[in-house]
């Protein structure tokens, strides 16, 4: 099997992006794991696959696979790179691009400065829709992780997120608490774990331990989930700068029942081809 690909990143969250409209490519879980290896493969956090639309009202279907080969529902940084990729490769000349995903639809708007704004949809806080095991919906849940008691928010941005407020992200126990939360029994589909430091009502610092990928330089849906939880808990206003290890995103949300918007860069690194 021979195919062309692009390497891209959104604030250091890096991707292998493949056009599966003009190329016939099949990715097994084993192949994805081998390609994701940073020593012997291409190396990436996620594989993004561009497919022809499943829905006639959309332009493309957008699939996301983690480095461990598991398919996931959402990737915000990937969505921005997806929009840049389909324009760079001449698959569309539109500036507003509609895509379907494993869990819904998204609108990707390419701005004049090259940044991309993504309508991430309406944040979902109902426990059974996250999914998260809880008796009822709460703004804050008490959870045990190892020997720690944590006060967390839970939300779905098309994929599940748990968010914990910390005093300082630099000293947060991401390496130990991240894996414990990712595989916590209360999240039957596993979860992305965010650790949020509130700088002020319009600025947070964030680190995210992504399910199936570990800690990444940036997580777009994680940034969205953190802001949604922060606004719901009364900690943040509706326009927030999110500072991640890889750089900054801008998030805007007017509150429950409203769609959330994320704006940030998408960078093309190089093109390549593989035979495997």
UniProtKB/Swiss-Prot annotation:
Substrate binds at residues 13, 46, 66, 76-77, 159, 192, 210-211, 220-221. It is an enzyme of class 5 (isomerase). The record marks 270 as: Important for dimerization. GO terms for biological process: lysine biosynthetic process via diaminopimelate. Keywords: Amino-acid biosynthesis, Cytoplasm, Isomerase, Lysine biosynthesis. GO terms for molecular function: diaminopimelate epimerase activity. Pfam families: DAP_epimerase. It is found in: Cytoplasm. The record marks 161, 210 as: Could be important to modulate the pK values of the two catalytic cysteine residues. Catalyzes the stereoinversion of LL-2,6-diaminopimelate (L,L-DAP) to meso-diaminopimelate (meso-DAP), a precursor of L-lysine and an essential component of the bacterial peptidoglycan. This is Diaminopimelate epimerase. It comes from Vibrio campbellii (strain ATCC BAA-1116). The lineage of its organism: Bacteria, Pseudomonadati, Pseudomonadota, Gammaproteobacteria, Vibrionales. The gene is dapF.
